[in-house]
Swiss-Prot record:
PANTHER family: TRANS-ACONITATE 2-METHYLTRANSFERASE, TRANS-ACONITATE 2-METHYLTRANSFERASE-RELATED. It is found in: Cytoplasm. It catalyses: trans-aconitate + S-adenosyl-L-methionine = (E)-3-(methoxycarbonyl)pent-2-enedioate + S-adenosyl-L-homocysteine. Disulfide bonds: none annotated. The gene is tam. InterPro entries: Methyltransf_25 (IPR041698), SAM-dependent_MTases_sf (IPR029063), Trans-aconitate_MeTrfase (IPR023506), Trans_acon_MeTrfase_C (IPR023149). Keywords: Cytoplasm, Methyltransferase, S-adenosyl-L-methionine, Transferase. It comes from Escherichia coli O17:K52:H18 (strain UMN026 / ExPEC). GO terms for cellular component: cytoplasm. GO terms for molecular function: trans-aconitate 2-methyltransferase activity. Its EC number is 2.1.1.144. This is Trans-aconitate 2-methyltransferase.
């Protein structure tokens, strides 16, 4: 897969950081020593962790060389590691694992989540936020355009669901706080929606296409977005964006 584009990702930095702020506010920890930010991206979520716990030893993990380089430049006091979340092993038990908009890209959550819990110290916390927009028009239309144009399915899998995550984490020995929030982002145009998803959800669909194939895909995608997202009276578009939040704390 081609590398992530930090500049494109940060074009909507405020909107992308807001869920991280709200997730962090629900973490029931006062003092922490060891923290991991899984899928840290360009370091916007890591900066929030550093602000709350300036004395903590924070490690950001991301598989993207470009994202890790951007994060290192922005936060030289933190450690950033280029690694696959599934394979990375901390040197010590973690007081907090923070994963904002990253775990949805990984398969087999029935194994992944218990594995992450096993990396926590006693009473440690796993805090997760994942986009829950697999059934939103933005993502349904990606699949429809790919089907129309005879491209293979390259999108991510849907989330396991609230009840499944509750059971997975409860059985792993955690107290679980889980909720879902839908944000309504004001977009100035349908092209702005494309700019948003091009940095994330649309990447797998476009990565192996030629330039002309990408343009053909995006032209059709734009047409379908216009049908699904009407303009408001002031010309803005409201983009519904559901997100699933989980705060799981080990009971021992």
């Amino acid at each position: 897969m081609s590398d992530w584009n930090p500049s494109l990702y940060l074009h909507f930095a405020a909107e992308r950081s807001r869920p991280a702020v709200e997730l962090l506010a629900r973490v029931p920890l006062e003092n922490v020593e060891y923290v991991a930010d899984l899928g840290c991206g360009p370091g916007n979520s890591t900066a929030l962790l550093q602000q709350r716990w300036p004395a903590a030893r924070i490690t950001g993990i991301d598989s993207s060389p470009a994202m890790v380089a951007e994060a290192r430049s922005a936060l030289p006091d933190c450690l950033f590691v280029e690694a696959d979340i599934r394979n990375w092993q901390p040197e010590q038990a973690l007081d907090l694992i923070f994963a904002n908009a990253s775990l949805q890209w990984l398969p087999d959550h029935y194994e992944l989540f218990p594995h992450l819990v096993s990396l926590l110290s006693p009473l440690g916390v796993l805090a997760v936020q994942m986009p829950d927009n697999w059934l939103e028009p933005t993502h349904v239309l990606m699949r429809e355009v790919a089907w129309e144009q005879n491209y293979p399915d390259r999108g991510r899998e849907p989330l396991a669901g609230v009840h499944a995550y509750y059971d997975i984490l409860s059985e792993a020995g955690c107290e679980v706080d889980i909720w879902r929030t839908t944000y309504y982002h004001q977009m100035p145009s349908h092209q702005a929606i494309i700019n948003w998803v091009t940095a994330t959800g649309l990447r797998p669909w476009l990565q192996d296409l030629t330039e002309s194939e990408q343009q053909h895909f995006l032209t059709r995608y734009h047409q379908m977005l216009e049908e699904q997202y009407p303009l408001q009276e002031n010309g803005q578009i409201l983009l519904a964006f559901p997100r699933l939040f989980i705060v799981a704390r080990r009971t021992e």
